[in-house]
Amino acid sequence: VKIGRLFFKGKKVLFSVKNRKIMTRIQNHMTKIVRILVFAFLMLIPVCGVAQDKIKIACIGNSITEGADNYPTPLARMLGNQYEVGNFGKWGHTLLRKGDHPYMSTDAFINAQKFQPNVVIIKLGTNDSKPENWKYKDEFETDLEYMISTFQKCGSKPKIIICRCIPASNNLYGIRNEIIKDEIYPIQKKVARKFHLKLVDLYSPLEHKVDSTCYVWDNVHLNKSGSLILAEHIYKAITGKKAPKLENAFVN
């Protein structure tokens, strides 16, 4: 019986030693795997960090946003590499859904939502002042609210900024400055207050500059000097800081 017990104990000891060797090997392999995974994770952090740190700005508007010498170009340069500025302007379009060219029926509107912006700049209303569009003026407020609500449903939960329309003078398009100043602006102000949004006054800085210093020949669209003024005011609305002075502001 003693020999049997001794034999049993000896077998148990041998099994235990063998077990320890196996466990040691497993631990060594696991340590190597963990080190590889940690290294891979650390290598991925810088790439992920850049993507996550980009603040996306969606510029919604008409030809003043989309066209030549547009303000999003210098705005992007002012903001720098931490920002991504998307130009979603559409030439000749209206905020009004019953307008002759409604912005909210365009691919640009859909793409702006897919962009998942962190900030949305709404600069629409100039083309709405035309007689054929302003006959639907009673719907301007609800349409502006609809656009705001649509962007607020984006997963990115963007900050929304409304821009007061810039002034216009005598022109061939039927754009009426008195409508922009006396009818559209009060609605923009009312909606901004209702939704607790920032309203950027782009009218006042250009009110006495509807000439060759800031506008092109048609008295509606801006040249580089005028667009630079817009970019500076919108930059301040986004960052709370004064815009930096740039050389070659319109170079992409």
Q: Which stretches of residues belong to each language-model region?
A:
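N-terminal secretory targeting modules
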Residues: 1-60, 64-73, 77-82, 113-118, ...
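Conserved SGNH/GDSL esterase-like catalytic core that processes O-acyl groups on lipids
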Residues: 53-59, 64-142
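Generic structural signal for well-ordered alpha-helices
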Residues: 144-148, 185
